[in-house]
Design a protein with these regions (language model features):
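Bacterial N-terminal signal peptides that target proteins for export
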Residues: 1-7
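Aromatic-rich carbohydrate-binding modules that target alpha-glucans
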Residues: 24-73, 81-110
Length: 111
């Protein structure tokens, strides 16, 4: 896998020893979104999906999806479903903005 010079890694624990959410560039035009934790389903929603839920694929305990993301500023969030409960999970060390509904979105900047 080739990583461009501007490749980045945003991954941090959401809770001390809890699940992790992350983002990393897969190549110059695609980004891999990941979630490592217990869940029934995980979805990416954001500007790059036109806010339509895109399912992450499970491999063991890790969920991921690779999405084409052009240059620019993109807001997104991961929605983690556990039974009746839905949690919004963002990488801990990422820029965040108000989502206009009392929550937050993460910000991804593609150079």
């Amino acid at each position: 896998m080739r990583f461009p010079t501007a490749a980045f890694l945003l991954a941090a624990a959401v809770a001390c020893a809890g699940p992790r959410a992350g983002v990393r560039s897969a190549n110059d035009a695609a980004v891999r979104f990941t979630y490592d934790g217990d869940a029934d389903e995980v979805y990416l929603t954001g500007d790059m999906t036109r806010w339509r839920p895109r399912p992450l694929v499970r491999a063991g305990r890790t969920w991921s999806t690779k999405v084409p993301v052009p240059r620019g500023r993109w807001e997104y969030r991961l929605e983690v479903h556990r039974g009746e409960r839905v949690d919004v999970v963002l990488p801990a060390d990422t820029e965040r903005v108000d989502d206009g509904f009392g929550g937050e979105n993460a910000v991804l900047r593609m150079p």
